[in-house]
Amino acid sequence: MIFSGKFTSHLLNYGFKPNNLRLLSTSTHPTIYFTGIQPTGIPHLGNFFGSIEPWTELQNSVDKNILMMLSVVDQHAISLGPLPANELRQNTHQMTASLIACGVDPNRTLLFRQSDVPQIAQISWILGSLQTTSKLARLPQYKEKKERFKKGDIPVGLLTYPLLQAADVLTFKATTVPVGEDQSQHLNLLGGLAYAFNKTYETEIFPIPKQLTRESHARIRSLREPEKKMSKSSGGPRSRIEITDSRSTIIEKCQKAQSDNAGKVTYDKENRLAVSNLLDLYSAVTKTQTSEIDFSNWTTLDLKMNLAEAVDKRLAPIRQKFEELQNTGEVDKVLTENGEKAREIAEKNLEEIRRTIGFL
């Protein structure tokens, strides 16, 4: 395992000694992959290419004896405040169905709902005793999101979000966490907490998880505002393509996507960002590099229609599988059975932790 300079620097805050680096890189813990995804309902293409597809590719390529865990993190979904119960329930069901439709295999990936494993919250509380509010308040994501609360009435869940995130991983002693670069600081904090716990209690209970970031296509951006990433939080429905969108909806959204009137299509992010954004999306959907696409004779209308055709072709089987799942009890069955399996692992690890710190 190779640690970045930032990561090693972060561990220094917990009393880490540089000559102990080898101890961290020779963990005897079995390899366990873990990641989480918030239940925001139906995923869009940004979610698909950014996290779901990389996970399914990993799932289908690693040794079958390696445990892979994917959590639908419904407790994180209320970190900014409560949601209507029916909305959260529906979003969780839709996200789970979407993951299965996109290729997440519940027989290969332990796909479960976070709130079905109460041990995670208990371990989050324990980790909180090793962290300070000042360090949590300095994290960039906290600084950014707290600005939404102009009156200063910031939910506690926003501040402690990284502790729960760390508990998600450490509860299962995960060794590898596939996440984007935007989560690097939270993962650094996670590693620091694992090290601090081990050092405080003179144990090796927790592995120091490593971040797995794959090289991928350019970040999927909004169809209406190409300077921003594709998101449900801004831009409106026409700014994104969801994985269950109908063919007609996909065509309409592509036709109305921002472009320009500069004639033939060229790839120029500096001067033609909107057109380049559509080419990046076409590249991701067709699994080709932008340099391999012959768009020399395309107009912007050609680009939009070709993009719509490619997106519909890619999403058609996913859309069909999602619809099939709506008429069965498979989603609930997966959440129930895998929730039991996840709790069994978590309870065993929690008992070890409780004995270590003196609760037992």
From Swiss-Prot:
Its EC number is 6.1.1.2. Catalyzes the attachment of tryptophan to tRNA(Trp). This is Tryptophan--tRNA ligase, mitochondrial. One of its GO terms (molecular function) is ATP binding. Complex locus in which transcription results in the production of one large primary transcript that gives rise to two functionally distinct proteins, wars-2 and prx-10. The gene is prx-10. It holds the Pfam family tRNA-synt_1b. It comes from Caenorhabditis elegans. L-tryptophan binds at D168. Keywords: Aminoacyl-tRNA synthetase, ATP-binding, Ligase, Mitochondrion, Nucleotide-binding, Protein biosynthesis, Transit peptide. ATP binds at Q38, H44, L45, G46, N47, G180, E181, D182, K229, M230, S231, K232, S233.
